[in-house]
Regions:
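Helix-to-beta-strand junctions that scaffold the AdoMet/dcAdoMet cofactor pocket
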Residues: 122-123, 138-139
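Conserved beta-strand signature within the Rossmann-like core of class I S-adenosyl-L-methionine
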Residues: 139-147
C-alpha cells in the first residue's frame, strides 16, 4: 500500500514523479488513462507490452488495478532516463531498449499491446510499419491513443516532436473501433485560456466519445 501521511499517496516518490511533476513521460489530467483502464481486461495473462512506455504510467496502473495471473509486463523504450526510472521502481518485469517501429516478438505471442501517445512521434511510413508489426505479434487486444490534432513541438523538447497525425479512417480501415476524448483544439502549457479549454475538454468528452471526429484525442481498440 502506498503511504498516506503528509499529503497522501502523492508523497510517494514514484507517484510524485508520475503524476505531479511536469516531466515528459508521465501523465497529465488531459491524458487518456481512465479510458485505457476501461478497455484493459480485469484479468491479465501472458505477455503485456507497453510500447514507448516512458516513465511507466501504464505499467504502474496495471499493477495497481488488475489481476495478473502469470502475466509478464514488458516495456519498450529508448530514453535512458525513462528506462532507469522504470528499473528503479520495478514497474515492468522486463524493459527492452528498442526503437520503433520493429517489435522484437514472435508472431501472435502478445496478449495485450498498449501504444499510448506514441504513434504520432513516428513518421507516417514508420507508423504504418508499426501497425503492421502490431497485427503480426498481437493475439489478444491492442489499445492505441493518439491526438486528433497536430501539436507543435514544445520549446526545448525536441524528443516529443510530433511527426504524423492519424485519422479515424486510418484505424477503422485496419479493424479498430475508434472512440474520442475531449474536444479538437490545441492544449498547451502556458496558454492563458488553458483552464477554460480543459473544462471544455471534459465537458465534451461524453459527446466526442460517441462522435470522435470532434475529439481532441482518439482511442482505437482492436481485438484479434
Amino acid at each position: 500500500m502506498l503511504p498516506t501521511k503528509k499529503g497522501g499517496c502523492f508523497e510517494h516518490p514514484l507517484v510524485k514523479n508520475l503524476f505531479v511533476e511536469k516531466i515528459p513521460g508521465g501523465t497529465s489530467p488531459l491524458f487518456p488513462q481512465p479510458f485505457i483502464a476501461y478497455f484493459t481486461p480485469i484479468i491479465l495473462k501472458g505477455d503485456i507490452v507497453d510500447l514507448g512506455c516512458g516513465k511507466g504510467i501504464n505499467g504502474f496502473l496495471i499493477r495497481l488495478s488488475r489481476y495478473l495471473q502469470g502475466a509478464k509486463l514488458i516495456g519498450l523504450e529508448i530514453n535512458n532516463d525513462y528506462i532507469n526510472f522504470c528499473k528503479k521502481f520495478n514497474i515492468y518485469d522486463q524493459i527492452i531498449k528498442q526503437p520503433l517501429p520493429k517489435l522484437p516478438f514472435k508472431d501472435k505471442s502478445v496478449n495485450l499491446i498498449l501504444c499510448t501517445e506514441v504513434i504520432e512521434h513516428l513518421t507516417r511510413k514508420e507508423g504504418l510499419i508499426l501497425l503492421d508489426e502490431i497485427d503480426r505479434v498481437c493475439k489478444g487486444r491492442t489499445i492505441i491513443t493518439t491526438p486528433n490534432i497536430f501539436f507543435e513541438t514544445m520549446p526545448g523538447d525536441p524528443e516529443d516532436k510530433h511527426l504524423s497525425i492519424w485519422s479515424i479512417k486510418d484505424f477503422k480501415s485496419r479493424g479498430y473501433k475508434v472512440y474520442g476524448i475531449g474536444l479538437k483544439m490545441p492544449l498547451l502549457w502556458g496558454d492563458k485560456f488553458l483552464k477554460i479549454k480543459q473544462a471544455l475538454y471534459y465537458f465534451f468528452t461524453p459527446i466526442s466519445y460517441i462522435f470522435p471526429f470532434i475529439s481532441g484525442s482518439l482511442i482505437a481498440v482492436k481485438d484479434f
